[in-house]
Amino acid sequence: MGVKLEIFRMIIYLTFPVAMFWVSNQAEWFEDDVIQRKRELWPPEKLQEIEEFKERLRKRREEKLLRDAQQNS
C-alpha cells in the first residue's frame, strides 16, 4: 500500500505542473481570458496622450544634453 501511494503522489506531483503549463500556453485561452481581463481592468490609453508623453521625454532629454554640452565646453 505504501509504495502504491508514493507512486500515485509522484504521478500527481509530475502531472500537475505539466498540465498547468499546457493549459496556460494555449493561445486561445490566453487571448480570451488574460488579454480580455487586462483590457477590462486597464483600458488602453489614447494614442495622442502617448505621443505627447514621448514628446515631453524627448524634449527633456534634449535639454539635458544641451546643458551637459554647455557645461563641458
Curated annotation (Swiss-Prot):
GO biological process terms, semicolon-separated: mitochondrial cytochrome c oxidase assembly
Keywords: Disease variant, Membrane, Mitochondrion, Mitochondrion inner membrane, Primary mitochondrial disease, Transit peptide, Transmembrane, Transmembrane helix
GO CC terms of this entry: mitochondrial inner membrane; mitochondrion
UniProt-recorded Gene Ontology molecular function terms: unfolded protein binding
InterPro entries linked to this entry: Pet100
ATP-binding listed as a keyword: no
Highest taxon, organism lineage: Eukaryota
Compartmental location: Membrane; Mitochondrion; Mitochondrion inner membrane
Segments passing through the bilayer: 7-24
Membrane topology: Single-pass membrane protein
Similarity remark: Belongs to the PET100 family.
Oligomeric and partner information: Interacts with COX7A2.
Associated pathology: Mitochondrial complex IV deficiency, nuclear type 12: An autosomal recessive mitochondrial disorder with onset in early infancy. MC4DN12 features include poor overall growth, metabolic acidosis, profoundly delayed psychomotor development, seizures, hypotonia, and brain abnormalities. Death may occur in the first years of life. Serum lactate and creatine kinase levels are increased. Patient tissues show decreased levels and activity of mitochondrial respiratory complex IV.
Role according to the record: Plays an essential role in mitochondrial complex IV maturation and assembly.
The protein's name in its UniProt record: Protein PET100 homolog, mitochondrial
Organism: Homo sapiens (Human)
Taxon lineage: Eukaryota, Metazoa, Chordata, Craniata, Vertebrata
Gene: PET100
